[in-house]
């Protein structure tokens, strides 16, 4: 299976660089994965596509203010993208610099000195030497790490809009974007309808934006991300399945978490890392339907939705979305694949 099979041409003006005024004002392309039937809707119509007995699974990870700036002791400028926090004084980060800092050297993260303990590929392990910890530095100086394709600096409103309304567990460097469409009002309507809700956690890593760089899909190595699928979520899923309801994953992060926990055919609680890679030919044991945004060409995420719904149907749906001027990527419109 070739990576080029998952390519498509997207007019640049369809990349959504800014969010709409209201979260739930986006559009929703409905795709029947059995028949390939496509229908255009408003996102708020989603309430009509779900029934009591269905279970919606959301990712409650919260985006960190992960972009920070600093310098070497020589004054040379540095830019950080915090990837993973080990403890308040110890963290993994990407560093953008003219010349890479050496292991053992001391550098500034904003106004605070840190020591470079290790380097693995493009990832540095830093330990803060000063009084402040990484949480305080992010709180005081941090920026929302917008995806590179937005081609703009973060603005004040991004701190709210690039975060889901139910975000709780700090740790992502990118938003679980399918959840951005859900307003507090829509969440309330879902509850009022008698549809059950559950939360898992997957902390999205920067690898989510990494294009597949090998020719053969099967030889791609996925980045690892930290997930938590609690016992009570597994119980809800079993109950939903037994009663004939559907498990509807909100976003590919929820899909990957649930399918990791259900890899043996039976959903089990899971805490730890996942590098699950779902591409055509892979089986889904847990998820019956999903809400997802439109994904980048040749990305692992367009491969995931192609595994769920069949590649030809997905490419056709994307062609329809382009023709109908849907908005693409993180701040863009969504699909309901069922």
Curated annotation (Swiss-Prot):
Entry's Gene Ontology BP terms: queuosine biosynthetic process; tRNA wobble guanine modification
GO molecular function, one term: S-adenosylmethionine:tRNA ribosyltransferase-isomerase activity
Entry's transmembrane regions: none
Catalytic reactions on record: 7-aminomethyl-7-carbaguanosine(34) in tRNA + S-adenosyl-L-methionine = epoxyqueuosine(34) in tRNA + adenine + L-methionine + 2 H(+)
Record key words, sorted: Cytoplasm, Queuosine biosynthesis, S-adenosyl-L-methionine, Transferase
Entry-linked InterPro entries: QueA (IPR003699), QueA_dom1 (IPR042118), QueA_dom2 (IPR042119), QueA_sf (IPR036100)
Transcription listed as a keyword: no
EC number: 2.4.99.17
Pathway: tRNA modification; tRNA-queuosine biosynthesis
Listed SUPFAM superfamilies: QueA-like (SSF111337)
Catalytic class of the enzyme: transferase
Any one of the GO CC terms: cytoplasm
Recorded superkingdom: Bacteria
Signal peptide, first to last residue: none
Keyword Transferase assigned: yes
Function: Transfers and isomerizes the ribose moiety from AdoMet to the 7-aminomethyl group of 7-deazaguanine (preQ1-tRNA) to give epoxyqueuosine (oQ-tRNA).
Family label: Belongs to the QueA family.
PANTHER family: S-ADENOSYLMETHIONINE:TRNA RIBOSYLTRANSFERASE-ISOMERASE
Known partners and oligomeric status: Monomer.
Designated name of the protein: S-adenosylmethionine:tRNA ribosyltransferase-isomerase
Species, as recorded: Francisella tularensis subsp. novicida (strain U112)
Lineage: Bacteria, Pseudomonadati, Pseudomonadota, Gammaproteobacteria, Thiotrichales
